[in-house]
C-alpha cells in the first residue's frame, strides 16, 4: 500500500480541519442549554445523545489526514472518560482551543518545543490551584447536586444520592434497562452471586419461586459432591441443631442431590444446594470472601480439610439466605468484622496494582459485596431512543459523583477554570514559553464562552465579567443569573476538571510538535470492467 506524506504547515492544517469537525460536533452539547447530536446506527433506531465521548467515537472522516486530527481529539475525550468518567465535552473544547491558538503561533514562527514547555508549566500551576480551591463533598445533598448537574435532571441526582447512601461510596451501582416508563432504584442488601438452586424441588416459597432459609448454617467447599456419605456426618450435626443448611459447592449431583431433595419433600430437614460462583482462581477468591463474610471456612483439600471430617464449627452463619432460580443472596453474614475489614483492604491493594479493566471490574464487585451491597438503577423511558440517551446520561452522572467523592468539588459551569486564570497569568516565562502560557490562558476561557453561546448569549461578555468577579461567583446559564456557584449547587468534580485540562494539554502539545504525517494513499477506482471474471464485462 503506497503512502502519502505531508509536512509541517500543510500536515498540521489538514489535521486541524479534522479537529474542528469533531470538536464542533461535540461542543454544541456543552452546558445546561446544550443541544443533542443524532448518531446513525446500522441496526435499530438512531442514538440521540449529548455525551461527548459517545459522539467522538462515532466520527470517521473520509480524508485520512483530517481523520487523524479527529482521532487525536477523540483520544482526549476517551482518556478523560476512562479516568474521570465525565467531562469529555470540556476536554474536547479545551483541546480544540489549545491546538488552534498554538497553530497560529507556530505558523507565525514560534518554536513548538518552547510552546510545549509553556503549556506544561501553565497546566501544572492550574492543576495545583484547582486542588487548592477544591472542597470535599459532604452529605447526601452535595452528592445529589453533582449528579443532577451531570445528568441535567434533579430526579436522577436524588436517585444516585440515595443509592450511594444505601450501599456506601465503595458500593457497586449498576444500570439496567427497565421494562416500564419510570426510573427506579433497587438495592440488594448483603452479598449476592449469580448462582441459583440446584433443583426446583428445594424452594420453600412456591409463590415467589424461591428458597428462603432463616438463620442457616453454610457449608462452603470447592469439591463436587455426588456421594451422600461425604456430607452425612455434617448433615446429622445440622439436623440436631434444627437449622436449615445452604451448601455452596462446585456441584451437587447424583445420590447426594436426590437425598437432599427427598428429605426436603418429606419435611425431615431443609437443605439448599447451589453451585460455587466464578471460575478458576476467581472462584477460590470468592469462596474465601463468602467464608470470611459468614465466619466459616472453605473446605478444600488444598487447605488440608476434608468433607467427611468437617464439624459444625467450620460452617458459616447468616441471619437469612434467599435463593432464586438465578441468584443467591446472603444477608447479614456472621463473620468477624476485623477479618472482613482486612479482606476489604487486601482487595483494595489488588485494585491499585491491577492494569486489566476486566479484573478491576471484578475486584470492585467483590469489594462492594463485602462492603455492603449492590444498588441497581432501573432506567425507564417511553421509547428505545430515549432509553439509550437517558442511560448514557445516568452513567455519566454516576461517574461524575464517584469522582466528586474521590477528589472533591469546584465551582461548575467553567467557573473553576476562570478562578485559576490569575494564578496562571502570574507565571514568569519568556519567549516561546510565555506564548505557551498565553495559549493555556486563552483555552481556559473557552468552556465558559461555549456554555454562554449554547445558551444564546455573547460568550466574550461573560468571560470578561468573570475575570473581575470574586472567586466562586459565576454565570448560571440555565437562569441567566450571576450566583455563588457552589451555594447554587452548580458544581463539577475536581477530578473531572483536572483530567480534562491535563489530557487536552497533552494532546495539544503532541499536535503542535508534529512535523510530518503519513497516511495510506487512497486507491483510485480503475473503473471499466465491473462484470464477473471471464464474462467479458457482460452481466
Curated annotation (Swiss-Prot):
Q: According to the UniProt entry, what is the EC number of this protein? A: 5.6.1.7
Q: Its GO CC terms?
A: cytoplasm
Instruction: State the CDD domains in the record.
Output: GroEL
Q: Which UniProt keywords apply?
A: ATP-binding, Chaperone, Cytoplasm, Isomerase, Nucleotide-binding
Q: Output the InterPro entries linked to this UniProt entry.
A: Chaperonin_Cpn60_CS, Cpn60/GroEL, Cpn60/GroEL/TCP-1, GroEL-like_apical_dom_sf, GROEL-like_equatorial_sf, TCP-1-like_intermed_sf
So where does ATP get bound?
Answer: 29-32, 86-90, 413, 476-478, 492
So which residues are the signal peptide here?
none
Q: What GO molecular functions are on record for this protein? A: ATP binding; ATP-dependent protein folding chaperone; isomerase activity; unfolded protein binding
Annotated Gene3D superfamilies: GroEL (3.50.7.10), GroEL-like equatorial domain (1.10.560.10), TCP-1-like chaperonin intermediate domain (3.30.260.10)
Q: Which PANTHER family match?
A: 60 KDA HEAT SHOCK PROTEIN, MITOCHONDRIAL
- SUBUNIT field: Forms a cylinder of 14 subunits composed of two heptameric rings stacked back-to-back. Interacts with the co-chaperonin GroES.
The family assignment reads:
Belongs to the chaperonin (HSP60) family.
Q: What is this protein called?
A: Chaperonin GroEL
Protein source organism: Parageobacillus thermoglucosidasius
Amino acid at each position: 500500500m503506497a503512502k502519502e506524506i505531508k509536512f509541517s504547515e500543510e500536515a498540521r492544517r489538514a489535521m486541524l480541519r479534522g479537529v474542528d469537525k469533531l470538536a464542533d460536533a461535540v461542543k454544541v452539547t456543552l452546558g445546561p442549554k446544550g443541544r443533542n447530536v443524532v448518531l446513525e446506527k446500522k441496526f435499530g433506531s438512531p442514538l440521540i445523545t449529548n455525551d461527548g465521548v459517545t459522539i467522538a467515537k462515532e466520527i470517521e472522516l473520509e480524508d485520512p489526514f483530517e481523520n487523524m486530527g479527529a482521532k487525536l481529539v477523540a483520544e482526549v475525550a476517551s482518556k478523560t472518560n476512562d479516568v474521570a468518567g465525565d467531562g469529555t465535552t470540556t476536554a474536547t473544547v479545551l483541546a480544540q482551543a489549545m491546538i488552534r491558538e498554538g497553530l497560529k503561533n507556530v505558523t507565525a514562527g514560534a518554536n513548538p518545543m518552547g510552546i510545549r514547555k509553556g503549556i506544561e508549566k501553565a497546566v501544572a500551576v492550574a492543576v495545583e490551584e484547582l486542588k487548592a480551591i477544591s472542597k470535599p463533598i459532604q452529605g447526601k445533598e452535595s452528592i445529589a447536586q453533582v449528579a443532577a448537574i451531570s445528568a441535567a435532571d434533579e430526579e436522577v441526582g436524588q436517585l444516585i444520592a440515595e443509592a450511594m447512601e444505601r450501599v456506601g461510596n465503595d458500593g457497586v451501582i449498576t444500570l439496567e434497562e427497565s421494562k416500564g416508563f419510570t426510573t427506579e432504584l433497587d438495592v440488594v442488601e448483603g452479598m449476592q452471586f449469580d448462582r441459583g438452586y440446584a433443583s426446583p424441588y428445594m424452594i420453600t416459597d412456591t409463590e415467589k419461586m424461591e428458597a428462603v432459609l432463616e438463620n442457616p448454617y453454610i457449608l462452603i467447599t470447592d469439591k463436587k459432591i455426588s456421594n451422600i456419605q461425604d456430607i452425612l456426618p455434617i448433615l446429622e450435626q445440622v439436623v440436631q441443631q434444627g437449622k436449615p443448611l445452604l451448601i455452596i459447592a462446585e456441584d451437587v449431583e447424583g445420590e447426594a442431590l436426590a437425598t437432599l431433595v427427598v428429605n426436603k419433600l418429606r419435611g425431615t430437614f431443609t437443605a439448599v444446594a447451589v453451585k460455587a460462583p466464578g471460575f478458576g482462581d476467581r472462584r477460590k477468591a470468592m469462596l474465601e470472601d463468602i467464608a470470611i463474610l459468614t465466619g466459616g471456612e472453605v473446605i478444600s483439600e488444598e487447605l488440608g480439610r476434608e468433607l467427611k471430617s468437617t464439624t459444625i464449627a467450620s460452617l458459616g452463619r447468616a441471619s437469612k439466605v434467599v435463593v432464586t432460580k438465578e441468584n443467591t443472596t446472603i444477608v447479614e453474614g456472621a463473620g468477624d468484622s476485623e477479618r472482613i475489614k482486612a479482606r476489604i483492604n487486601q482487595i483494595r491493594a489488588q485494585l491499585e496494582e491491577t492494569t486489566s479493566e476486566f479484573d478491576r471490574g471484578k475486584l470492585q464487585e467483590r469489594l462492594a459485596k463485602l462492603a455492603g451491597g449492590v444498588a441497581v438503577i432501573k432506567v425507564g423511558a417511553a421509547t428505545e431512543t430515549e432509553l439509550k440517551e437517558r442511560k448514557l446520561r445516568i452513567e455519566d452522572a454516576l461517574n461524575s459523583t464517584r469522582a466528586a467523592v474521590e477528589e472533591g468539588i469546584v465551582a461548575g459551569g467553567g467557573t473553576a477554570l476562570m478562578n485559576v486564570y490569575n494564578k496562571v497569568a502570574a507565571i514568569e516565562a519568556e519567549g516561546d514559553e510565555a506564548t505557551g502560557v498565553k495559549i493555556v490562558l486563552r483555552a481556559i476561557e473557552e468552556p465558559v464562552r461555549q456554555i454562554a453561546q449554547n445558551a444564546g448569549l455573547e460568550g466574550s461578555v461573560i468571560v470578561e465579567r468573570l475575570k473581575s468577579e470574586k472567586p466562586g461567583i459565576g454565570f448560571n446559564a440555565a437562569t441567566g443569573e450571576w450566583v455563588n456557584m457552589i451555594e447554587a449547587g452548580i458544581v463539577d468534580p475536581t477530578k473531572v476538571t483536572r483530567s480534562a485540562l491535563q489530557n487536552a494539554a497533552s494532546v495539544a502539545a503532541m499536535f503542535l510538535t508534529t512535523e510530518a504525517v503519513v497516511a495510506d494513499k487512497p486507491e483510485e477506482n480503475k473503473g471499466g470492467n465491473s462484470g464477473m471474471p471471464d464474462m467479458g464485462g457482460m452481466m
